[in-house]
Amino acid sequence: IKDGRVSFPRGKEKEYNVKDRKGLMQEDRNYLFVKRFTAKEERRRLQCGIYLKRYLSSFTYISSQNKANFIDGLQGLSECAVYGLYVIFNSTLYDVYYRILNGSTQVNSTEINAMPVPDMSVIEAMGKQLIAAKNLSVEQCNNILNHYVNG
């Protein structure tokens, strides 16, 4: 995960689909990936990257490593929804909230799933704003989220 996006390939051995590791295989669709492990020294606990199906559209499945959680919808997520979720999980508000929930450097998927999020229509609206801004910075995410939180 680098600069708000999933960076692939990284040039490491065995980073491609490993068919014998079914637990690491996902259908190729839009996801928000969240790093599972962060160092104590890192400023942020929630570090996420956008992955869109169109990046590798020729594949039916993709493989991830167990060092990343992924956020997905039951019916998949639109690109706007992925960007909207990025606004939420890349914001300072949610990073601080997560640190209050969990003092560990490991980002737990159970705790991510328990975090409150707005309705999907709001998430998609935030995503549209982020796409239009063409700026994935924490500050931009904070500005968009604050508009919805504070009115």
Language-model region placement:
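Polybasic, glycine- and aromatic-enriched phosphate-binding surface used to engage nucleic acids
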Residues: 1-132
